């Protein structure tokens, strides 16, 4: 039995509001020590009107009637008269006076809150695997292991999910005497011909040889501890602090998928995490339920960026975004968007050398100029400080940068005239051969070949005819030095406007022009450069170091980008 007691809305310290559905999964993310766990504690404390920090300052929630609450209490607890009348249940003790106070105000008495809402800290889930006192099978369970003994469907869910992660089933040893330890292994199968005493001895003999859950490592105990509480039916909502703790990435991803599975439908979950694997797992199984809150801190001030359901669905359903590493940006203070993996490798190495005293940003390849805006939109909504690093020929197609300007607080109109100036200059000298003239030129080269064999020189001549270089190609190959006079001044003004929006065009044109001594191009270029010039302080990298130093050059520029 579970009461319908949803949290309807959260109000954060900065006044932002997040409305919730009855089965929402709210995931708090952000850098270390930003306030993720504090947000969980604030929500949990407000439910019972207890002191709280105030990162979440208001919680609007629906409180079930007294009769509904009392029906649940009678079903899942044991009433005891001594020393005073009270109810004992799974993780709670409720006294008569707390029942009397239930209807006197909008908040929950603390003990009743603990019955209906579970706050699963690291210590709580590690200790959940400890042996429990054996109880009467006819009474309610007062702990998760006792519940495993009483509820076969609950045991099946816990055991199957644990087996998916660790290839071992879970079995409570209720033949051990005064305590019920949790064993790792399959439930013994007995013969119909055995007597009751033989069955007891047989099962005890097998279970006593199994590994004990409470003696395992923290990863096993943490994973199992979460499962033990997650599948308890009566909780209206759960709060789980960093469920990925002690888990390897594949297990963290599986835990995320379990958290978002259909077994948790109809219940709200509030999670704090710094694991992209766990978040990806939740998104893969329950994207429609997820709300993301990115918490950051500067000094004593916290900031909150809210990602609503539509944004989350775009993040999880758009193939480009889903299979990128964009989710990882949630856990970094800054992100650098590059065109390719090779760009990311090169710029990260230069950053780590030139700006070693600063936290390294996430370097994220987007797969081409036209895709920068897709990533920038999400990063902006999440309040993530970012830099876009395109080749200079991003100017060729305004559609590739118009939205970047808009997100950054500027506009196409602010650069339109200068762009036309640059465009006209670059395209003024383009002369292309007609098809007839091109065929004539190639025929002449082929006719001159001796012995019917085409030499490398002749191939080069043909390629030269076909590969007519435009002014845009020259801009990409030489950067701003391809321009002179007023077009160069216009380019400089565009460059300044772009930088104010967090867009830093490669000053030498494209990545490969930073080290002209290496003629490779494409994915292998960066690896070849590092092999030829392993000392990143070498003068050959001076232009690249200067360029990387220009990103976020001051607090003013950083503030501009952070407001995108």
Which ranges hold each PLM region?
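Short, basic, glycine/proline-bearing loop/turn elements
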Residues: 140-145, 208-213, 243-245, 310-311, ...
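Extended helical coiled-coil dimerization/tether regions that scaffold
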Residues: 120-223, 228-237
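Short amphipathic alpha-helical segments and helix-helix/interface helices
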Residues: 159, 256-260, 279, 283, ...
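Conserved P-loop NTP-binding catalytic core
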Residues: 42-137
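Acidic, Mg2+-coordinating catalytic modules of nucleic-acid enzymes
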Residues: 1-19, 24, 49-51, 67-73, ...
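Switch/communication elements of ASCE P-loop NTPase nucleotide-binding domains
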Residues: 1-52, 193-328, 345, 515, ...
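Positions that flank functional sites
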Residues: 177-178, 245, 394-395
């Amino acid at each position: 039995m579970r009461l319908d007691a949803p949290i309807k809305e959260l109000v954060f310290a900065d006044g932002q509001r997040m409305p919730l559905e009855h089965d929402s999964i709210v995931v708090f993310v952000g850098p270390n020590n930003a306030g993720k766990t504090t947000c969980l504690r604030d929500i949990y404390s407000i439910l019972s009107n207890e002191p709280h920090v105030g990162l979440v300052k208001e919680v609007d929630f629906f409180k079930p009637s007294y009769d509904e609450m009392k029906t649940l209490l009678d079903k899942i607890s044991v009433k005891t008269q001594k020393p005073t009348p009270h109810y004992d249940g799974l993780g709670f003790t409720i006294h008569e006076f707390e029942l009397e106070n239930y209807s006197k105000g909008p908040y929950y008495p603390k003990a009743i809150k603990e019955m209906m809402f579970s706050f699963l800290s690291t210590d709580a889930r590690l200790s959940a695997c400890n042996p429990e006192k054996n109880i009467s099978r006819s009474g309610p369970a007062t702990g998760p292991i006792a519940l495993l003994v009483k509820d076969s469907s609950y045991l099946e869910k816990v055991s199957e999910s644990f087996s998916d992660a660790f290839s071992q089933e879970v079995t409570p040893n209720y033949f051990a005497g005064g305590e019920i330890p949790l064993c790792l292994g399959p439930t013994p199968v007995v013969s119909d011909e055995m007597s009751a005493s033989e069955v007891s001895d047989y099962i005890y003999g097998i279970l006593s040889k199994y590994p004990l859950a409470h003696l395992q490592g923290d990863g096993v105990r943490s994973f199992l501890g979460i499962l033990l509480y997650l599948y308890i039916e009566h909780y209206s909502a759960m709060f789980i602090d960093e469920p990925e703790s002690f888990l390897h990435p594949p297990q963290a991803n599986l835990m995320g998928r379990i958290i978002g599975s259909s077994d948790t439908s109809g219940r709200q979950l509030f999670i704090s995490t710094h694991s992209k694997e766990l978040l990806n797992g939740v998104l893969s199984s329950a994207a429609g339920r997820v709300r993301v809150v990115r918490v950051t801190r500067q000094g004593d001030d916290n900031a909150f960026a809210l990602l609503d359901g539509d944004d989350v669905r775009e993040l999880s359903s758009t193939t480009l975004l889903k299979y990128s590493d964009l989710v990882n940006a949630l856990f970094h203070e800054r992100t650098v968007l590059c065109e390719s993996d090779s760009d990311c490798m090169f710029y990260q190495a230069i950053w780590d050398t030139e700006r070693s005293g600063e936290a390294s940003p996430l370097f994220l390849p987007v797969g081409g100029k036209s895709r920068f805006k897709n990533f920038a939109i999400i990063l902006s909504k999440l309040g993530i400080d970012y830099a876009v690093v395109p080749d200079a020929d991003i100017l060729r197609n305004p559609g590739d940068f118009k939205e970047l300007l808009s997100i950054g607080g500027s506009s196409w109109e602010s650069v339109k005239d200068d762009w036309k100036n640059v465009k006209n200059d670059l395209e003024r000298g383009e002369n292309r051969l007609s098809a007839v003239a091109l065929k004539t030129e190639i025929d002449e080269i082929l006719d001159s070949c001796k012995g019917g064999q085409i030499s490398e020189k002749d191939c080069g001549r043909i390629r030269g005819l076909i590969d007519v270089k435009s002014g845009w190609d020259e801009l990409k190959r030489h950067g701003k030095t391809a321009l002179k006079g007023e077009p160069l001044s216009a380019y400089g003004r565009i460059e300044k406007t772009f930088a104010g929006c967090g867009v830093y065009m490669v000053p030498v044109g494209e990545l490969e022009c930073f080290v002209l001594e290496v003629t490779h191009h494409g994915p292998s270029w960066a690896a070849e450069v590092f092999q030829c010039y392993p000392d990143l302080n070498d003068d050959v990298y001076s232009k690249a170091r200067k360029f990387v130093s220009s990103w976020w050059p001051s607090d003013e520029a950083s503030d501009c980008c952070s407001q995108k």
